[in-house]
């Protein structure tokens, strides 16, 4: 239909794309710039981690909460509130990462018939999957896997990598998706057990 507009852009977050689409003649607010900065894992703007920690604490999100947020030039008040939350979050992430173990996953690499076993680090983490996954990726040099059991007994997997390692190759094998440095899929408990042998 003529009413559909699709834009795929790996250099902008969905929040930034939506703002620019619906407000083409308006300066992008600092809040949206910070959301974009964190969503793409750039952290080029001071305070993005703190701001995200504050926003994550608002869950479950509602339109009333978003309407109450400041879209002013600075987000200084939100940074300050988020800084305390971020300190506590970082402690939790480090505690979770301390329980990681090696994970061995086979996935395609290069050609269709070229499969490799890759060793990374994995941990059960129902919270802070992105942060935990990135810490594990830094430690392993390949990938980090933050997983948890959902209410149906399926294993929700959040893969992260830093640099050139492509975690989407793993997720796609198991019916998931994502991009080079962040991907996810859902697998059975038996599959997870194979990865953690």
Task: Give names to the regions the model predicted.
Residues 28-37, 66-77, 149-154:
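Short alpha-helical "patches" and their helix-cap loops
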Residues 21, 34, 38, 54-57, ...:
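Residues that form generic nucleotide/phosphate-binding pockets
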Residues 12, 25, 29, 83, ...:
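Electropositive phosphate-/nucleotide-binding environments in soluble metabolic enzymes
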Residues 22-25, 57, 66, 74, ...:
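Generic signature of intrinsically disordered, low-complexity segments enriched in small/polar residues
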Residues 1-62:
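Short alpha-helices
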Residues 45-124:
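Active-site rim beta-loop-alpha module in soluble metabolic enzymes
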Residues 94-197:
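Gly/His-enriched, cation/cofactor- and phosphate-binding structural elements
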